[in-house]
């Protein structure tokens, strides 16, 4: 399988010596589980054009300091790319900003939280355990969070 990673943000300067970029972090993480996956990286944040949907096998969209409501020239084409990929049934995963831009592109609503930044560790209740999660899910999970934007309306047909 070939995974196309769409880079939408740059790693903050203080940690670039240890973590060069988000695509590298994801390649390292995913390759530990499946070393046979091939990767292609497209950096929209650095002006690289989005690929043609035809032939793509799977897409991962990284995090970014941008918000879906920001007026950057790469956000609208990325949203169209997401819609085109969804229409072509190409599997997509969004991390942080990636899931927010996917939600907005597919008909959901994302806002800047009126409470400001959410930073720290947060616990979430697991409401469903789909087959692809292995069928053995915990009742709750705790994960580190750092965000100020949130999806407040899911796209049609989406579930959490």
Can you name each region flagged by the protein language model?
Residues 10, 46-48, 99, 117, ...:
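Residue-level detector of flexible, active-site-proximal loop/helix-junction positions
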Residues 1-73, 77-80, 84-88:
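N-terminal beta1-alpha1 cap of cysteine-dependent amidohydrolase-like domains
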Residues 49-54, 101-103, 152-155:
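Short loop/helix-cap segments at secondary-structure boundaries that form the rim of catalytic
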Residues 65-130:
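Cysteine-nucleophile active-site neighborhood
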Residues 24-28, 100, 149:
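Active-site phosphate/pyrophosphate- and oxyanion-stabilizing loops and adjacent acidic/basic residues
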Residues 106-160:
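Pocket-forming structural segment of enzyme catalytic cores
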């Amino acid at each position: 399988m070939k995974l196309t990673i769409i880079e939408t943000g740059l790693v903050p300067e203080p940690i670039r010596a240890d973590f060069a970029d988000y695509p590298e972090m994801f390649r390292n993480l995913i390759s530990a589980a499946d070393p046979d996956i091939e990767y292609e990286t497209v950096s929209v944040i650095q002006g690289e054009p989005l690929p043609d949907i035809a032939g793509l096998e799977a897409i991962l969209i990284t995090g970014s300091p941008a918000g879906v409501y920001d007026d950057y020239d790469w956000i609208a084409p990325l949203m169209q790319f997401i819609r085109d990929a969804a229409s072509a049934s190409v599997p997509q995963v969004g991390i942080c900003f990636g899931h927010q831009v996917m939600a907005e592109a597919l008909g959901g609503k994302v806002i800047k939280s009126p409470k400001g930044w959410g930073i720290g560790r947060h616990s979430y209740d697991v409401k469903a355990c789909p087959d692809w999660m292995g069928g053995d899910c915990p009742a709750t999970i705790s994960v580190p969070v750092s965000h100020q934007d949130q999806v407040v309306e899911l796209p049609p047909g989406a579930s959490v």
